[in-house]
C-alpha cells in the first residue's frame, strides 16, 4: 500500500539490477521493473531475461548507442507525459554509473529521482569463491577503484598509492590493464596473494 506522500511525489528510478542473474535482483527492483511504463536499459550490459519481467505494454529503450544527454532528454519527455520511468544499471548505480550527472539534470527540471541499489561485481566475485574480504589481523578495509585508462585518476589515487595499504583491493573496468596492474601490485602484495578475475561476471561461470 502506497503512502499519501508516495502517491503525490512521482520519481524517476535508477535501478541496480546486479550482475545480470535474475535471482540476484532485489524485490524492490523487480517490482519496479514489473510496473514501469518506460524502461531504459543498457542492452550491451544487461541480459534480456531481466527485461522479460516487464509489462508487455511497456516501452523498452536501449541506451547502448545513446549519449547521456540524449537518454536524460528522452527520460524527461516520457516523465512529462505522465509515465512511470525507470533506468536500469548493471551492478549498482552508485558505482561507475554516472548517476550523479543524471540526477543533476533531472533536478534542473524539478524532477524527483531515487536510486535503488543492486548487487555489485565485487560481491559476486567474493561469493563465488567464498572469499572473505575483511579478515581479522589481515585487513578490515576494502578499496574499490580502477586501474586508470581513458578516465584520469585523482591525485594520490594511483594504483601504486592505494596498493601501499595492502587492503582488499577491487579493480573495476580494468580488464585491459591486468599485466600492468599485476606488476604494480607485486611491489606490495606477496606473490601467493589470492586474485579473482572476472569479465562480464553475469554468473559464477564468468569468474576464475
Protein language model annotation of sequence segments:
Residues 1-7:
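Short, Lys/Arg-enriched N-terminal segments with co-localized hydrophobic residues
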Residues 7-116, 124:
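Class I S-adenosyl-L-methionine
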Residues 15-16, 87-89, 145-146, 172-173, ...:
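Short beta-strand segments
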Residues 121-133:
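Structured adenosyl-cofactor binding patch, chiefly the S-adenosyl-L-methionine
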Residues 131-145:
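Short, glycine-/small-residue-rich phosphate/pyrophosphate-handling segment
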Residues 141-156:
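A short, charged helix-loop
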Residues 156-194:
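Conserved anion/nucleotide-ligand pocket segment
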Residues 205-206:
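Conserved small/polar residues in nucleotide/adenosyl-binding loops
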Amino acid at each position: 500500500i502506497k503512502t499519501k506522500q508516495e502517491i503525490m511525489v512521482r520519481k524517476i528510478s535508477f535501478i541496480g539490477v546486479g550482475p545480470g542473474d535474475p535471482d540476484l535482483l532485489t524485490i524492490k527492483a523487480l517490482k519496479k521493473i514489473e510496473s514501469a511504463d518506460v524502461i531504459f536499459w543498457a542492452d550491451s550490459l544487461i541480459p534480456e531475461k531481466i527485461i522479460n519481467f516487464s509489462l508487455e505494454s511497456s516501452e523498452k529503450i536501449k541506451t547502448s548507442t545513446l549519449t547521456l544527454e540524449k537518454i536524460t532528454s528522452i527520460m524527461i519527455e516520457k516523465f512529462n507525459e505522465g509515465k512511470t520511468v525507470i533506468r536500469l544499471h548493471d551492478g549498482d548505480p552508485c558505482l561507475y554509473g554516472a548517476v550523479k550527472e543524471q540526477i543533476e539534470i533531472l533536478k534542473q527540471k524539478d524532477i524527483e529521482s531515487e536510486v535503488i541499489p543492486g548487487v555489485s561485481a565485487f560481491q559476486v566475485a567474493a561469493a563465488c569463491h567464498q572469499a572473505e574480504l575483511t579478515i581479522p589481523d589481515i585487513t578490515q578495509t576494502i578499496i574499490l577503484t580502477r586501474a586508470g585508462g581513458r578516465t584520469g585518476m585523482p591525485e594520490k589515487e594511483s594504483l601504486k598509492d592505494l596498493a601501499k595499504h595492502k587492503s582488499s583491493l577491487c579493480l573495476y573496468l580494468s580488464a585491459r590493464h591486468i599485466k600492468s596492474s599485476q606488476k604494480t601490485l607485486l611491489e606490495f602484495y606477496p606473490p601467493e596473494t589470492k586474485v579473482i578475475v572476472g569479465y562480464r561476471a553475469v554468473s559464477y561461470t564468468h569468474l576464475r
